[in-house]
Design a protein with these regions (language model features):
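Short carbohydrate-recognition loop motifs
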Residues: 29-37
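Start-of-domain marker
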Residues: 1-12
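Short, ordered beta-strand-loop transition motifs
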Residues: 4-6, 26-30
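Solvent-exposed adhesion/ligand-recognition segments of exported proteins
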Residues: 15, 22-27
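Short, surface-exposed polybasic-and-hydrophobic patches located at secondary-structure transitions
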Residues: 11-14, 76-77
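Extended, compositionally simple hydrophobic/Ser/Thr-rich segments
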Residues: 1-2, 42, 50-52, 57-188
Length: 188
């Protein structure tokens, strides 16, 4: 899925002609849902590409094994919530007062841009790389073997339960709690 900042809303799907009838798009509780219909087993020869145009990003999520790529920078006035459940991958450039990034599973998330406060959590083996997302304050928690990298110029509050590692840059003051073999380290 490709996200593009635009004045209006639009969804475009590129797929093999015989697969398009089995793809559902609908809005549920203010969220755009794109998925295959229930009880359908798809065997496609090429990837399905979904391009979504929207004026502002409030949240984005993957359940399963999809990819989300922001083709433009997204600016928000409130918190932006980003979540991967499964093995998906997300790459976004965001600018908002607060960002929440969460992975459950083995997904990968790459974030850049600017924020005041970021909260990151990884449960499982997922990786969050927010080293290019300039933040003042970071609250970071890894449970399992997932690794998280952040930039924080004021504070880093790190919690590890397991073997995951937390790395940080930006010079923020660090407080950490470690239960397991993981580590908290400053990097350049």
């Amino acid at each position: 899925m490709h996200l593009v900042k635009d004045a209006g809303y639009a969804v475009e799907i590129e797929a093999e002609e015989n697969i398009i009838p089995y793809i559902e798009t609908y809005v549920n509780d203010g969220k755009l849902i794109v998925r295959y219909k229930d009880d359908v087993n798809i065997n496609n020869r090429r990837d399905v590409t979904v391009t979504v145009a929207l004026p502002e990003l409030e949240e984005a999520g993957i359940t399963g094994s999809g990819d989300i790529t922001g083709e433009t920078k997204f600016t928000g006035n409130d918190e932006i919530e980003l979540e991967i459940t499964g093995s998906g991958s997300m790459r976004l450039n965001v600018d908002a007062p607060a960002i929440e990034a969460k992975i459950t599973g083995s997904g990968d998330m790459y974030l850049s841009g600017n924020t005041r406060d970021i909260k990151c959590s990884s449960t499982g083996s997922g990786k969050i790389d927010a080293g290019e997302l300039k933040s003042e304050n970071a609250v970071v928690k890894t449970m399992g073997s997932g690794n998280i990298h952040v930039f924080a110029s004021v504070t880093v509050n790190a919690t590890i339960n397991g073997s995951g590692d937390i790395t940080y840059k930006g010079g923020g003051a660090v407080s950490s709690k470690i239960h397991g073999s993981g580590s908290v380290k400053a990097v350049d």
